[in-house]
Amino acid sequence: MLEDLGWGKDTIDVIVFVSSSADYVVPPTACIIQEELGLPETCLSIEIKHGCSGWVVGLNSAASLIMGGCLKRALLLCGDTSTLLHSPFDKETRPLFGDAGSCTALEFDTIASTLEFEHGTRGKDFKSIYTPVGGCRNAVTAKDLEFIEYGPNQLRRNIDCTMDGMNVFAFGMSVAPKSVKRLAEKYVLNLEQMDYLFLHQANHYMNEKIRKKLNFAPEKTPYSLRDFGNTSCASIPVTIIT
């Protein structure tokens, strides 16, 4: 990408890395990426822990960092090895996910229009997608490494990610369409004039329901889900280039 853009490595001012599957507890993987890419030590490295909404959150963060003009060029790196976060014996959840990464380049431009965003947080539902142990609140014990049967084809450890599929589905159906409409109203956008609707690739059935609620034609709503599964924070950029 840098070669295609004609950007020298020494011109990168900041990298923003978004992931739920960092290499280590410490240090931030963003710092390791700076070294692996051979970027200068003057490059600011920031790491954001986010999943489904990660690319949008990262894009907002990277754009905000360069908007003032002090930092000129940014790389937004989004990637997850989601399959490693789930039990290999959880046949209900693990097959839904794929591993992927993306890189988005941003550059300060004095005549560029401002990027507009609609954000929100619902912290009360944090257990809808949840890994019970492994952080500082609940340290791993020997018992947490034992597999527990939760149902047919569902063997998980406490260190494995769990997902309340029905709650996630209900959230997507109720919140996503309203969020898009609020964005359109806030910035006076005519959704009928939009070229594409790129949705996080969580569930085809759910996304089709959202598409219909927003009156987007099928050809304006691309998918990468069939080929790559749910690729977490990378799903939107993966869909854009697919």
Tell me the role of every PLM-derived stretch:
Residues 1-13, 140-195, 206-210, 214:
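Conserved active-site "lid/cap" helical segment
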Residues 18-24, 50-53, 78-83, 120-122, ...:
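Acidic, glycine-rich active-site loops and adjacent beta-strand->loop/helix elements
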Residues 21-22, 35, 40-42, 47-70, ...:
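Claisen-condensing/thiolase-fold acyl-transfer catalytic domains that form or cleave C-C bonds
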Residues 25-38, 76-82, 145-152, 206-218:
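Acidic-glycine-rich active-site phosphate/pyrophosphate-binding loop
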Residues 26-28, 60, 86-90:
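Short acidic, glycine/serine/threonine-rich loops at helix termini
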Residues 67-101:
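Flexible, glycine-rich active-site loops centered on histidine and acidic residues
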Residues 90-170, 174, 178:
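Condensing-enzyme catalytic core mediating Claisen C-C bond formation in acyl metabolism
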